């Protein structure tokens, strides 16, 4: 009886000691509050559950939709819905979590996007946001965001103006 209880306890401890990193994620060990080691891509990671956790960072493409009122060259506010497609570079995941924390999307991506989109849209007329210059506006926002975020470990794949009102 004691052996079976000990065996069940050992098996449950082993299962609590492993974490699965799925495809499109990297895992970084956090031991006693400090990030240690290098990011590990998909697979099983074994940890000591009382002192270590795994911080998972998605490296697949993320689609972030944002609704904003953007200024135009005439001084009008144009309501818009815009999508940002981006991903995190696997080798920079540790640096991102160390520098910014788990809330990196709100802190870096969205604040940079709001600034870049307001700067770019203020150079165009409101009618240009509905016409053929839409692609130019998207490309300018993407270039400005990429310039600011590429050294921090983010790849901006695309910026899409979905609806303009």
Where are the predicted features?
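Amphipathic, coiled-coil-like alpha-helical scaffolding segments used for oligomerization/assembly
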Residues: 85, 105-165
């Amino acid at each position: 009886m004691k052996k079976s209880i000990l065996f069940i306890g050992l098996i449950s401890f082993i299962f609590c000691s492993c974490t699965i990193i799925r495809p499109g994620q990297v895992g970084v060990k956090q031991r006693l509050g400090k990030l240690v080691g290098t990011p590990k891509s998909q697979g099983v990671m074994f940890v000591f559950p009382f002192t270590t956790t795994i911080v998972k960072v998605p490296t697949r493409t993320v689609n972030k939709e944002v609704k904003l009122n953007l200024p135009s060259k005439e001084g009008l506010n144009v309501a818009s819905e815009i999508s940002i497609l981006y991903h995190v570079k696997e080798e920079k995941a540790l640096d991102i979590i160390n520098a910014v924390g788990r809330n990196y999307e709100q802190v870096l991506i969205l604040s940079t996007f709001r600034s870049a989109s307001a700067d770019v849209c203020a150079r165009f007329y409101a009618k240009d946001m509905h016409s053929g210059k839409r692609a130019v506006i998207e490309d300018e926002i993407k270039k400005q965001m990429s310039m600011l975020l590429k050294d921090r470990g983010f790849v901006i794949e695309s910026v899409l103006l979905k609806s303009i009102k």
